[in-house]
A protein has these predicted regions:
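Outer-membrane beta-barrel channels and translocator barrels
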Residues: 1, 44-46, 89-93, 145-149
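Flexible loop and strand-edge segments within Gram-negative outer membrane beta-barrel domains
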Residues: 2-43, 48-49, 57-79
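Membrane-embedded beta-strand positions of outer-membrane beta-barrel proteins
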Residues: 6-8, 51-53, 98-100, 152
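Short beta-strand segments enriched in hydrophobic/aromatic residues
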Residues: 10, 41-43, 55, 90, ...
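Transmembrane beta-barrel outer-membrane domains
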Residues: 26-32, 71-79, 91, 127-133, ...
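Hydrophobic, lipid-facing positions within transmembrane beta-strands of outer-membrane proteins
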Residues: 31-37, 53, 78-84, 132-138, ...
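Surface-exposed coil/turn segments at beta-strand junctions on protein surfaces, enriched
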Residues: 42, 75, 89-91, 139, ...
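Signature of Gram-negative outer-membrane beta-barrel scaffolds
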Residues: 97-188
């Protein structure tokens, strides 16, 4: 038996402040958008699978303007996520869960542009950072007796940052970028 679910959320808020006496205007928009596609599959009465594809988008801006001066700062995070979770229940007293998860992150940290009179500052490229995050897990819940229960598991997590570590490194136009990797096995 199969079931397919599609869901989404979109929310954008804006804070505005203006003062006509000195001609200053401030606008701070921010918000989230997310969508997910989920597929549930029942292999048999003991094995169940849940697969999810998820996209999320977070945006934040700060804009200020006063007659001859403008400043805009933008940042955001986009995530693409895939999860596959299995639940195996050989009997009422024993449940095994296992699965994997992968997320691709795209960070846009604090890009700025501005104007002062006729002088305009606009970056040629938007500075971004990227990372990959993944995990495999396994857990076993076993009720030995009504008073003795065992819950054990392992999770292998990995995080990889790709790209320049700081904006200063980015401005140097280095040919190579820095990659950081973190991997751990975690008992559960």
């Amino acid at each position: 038996k199969d079931r397919l679910y599609l869901s989404g959320y979109f929310g954008r808020d804006v804070f505005n402040f203006g003062n006509t006496d000195n001609g200053i205007g401030i606008e701070i928009p921010w918000g989230n958008a997310t969508t997910s596609l989920r597929w549930n599959h029942l292999f048999n009465d003991k094995l169940f699978m849940n697969t999810s594809l998820i996209f999320s988008d977070y945006r934040f801006e700060f804009n200020i303007a006063q007659s001859e001066f403008e400043l805009k700062i933008f940042s955001g995070i986009n995530d693409w996520n895939t999860k596959v979770d299995f639940l195996y229940q050989p009997n009422q007293r024993h449940t095994i869960k296992f699965g994997l998860n992968y997320t691709y992150h795209e960070f846009t940290p604090g890009n700025a542009s501005g104007r002062s009179g006729d002088v305009v500052f606009e970056p040629d490229e938007i500075f971004k950072q990227y990372s990959n995050e993944g995990a495999f897990y396994f857990s076993d819940d076993f009720d030995v007796t009504d008073d003795l229960k065992i819950h054990a598991g392992l999770r292998y997590s990995s995080f990889q940052h790709s790209g320049y570590i700081s904006f200063r490194d980015y401005l140097k136009n280095d040919v190579t970028s820095s990659d950081d990797n973190y991997r751990h096995i975690e008992p559960r």
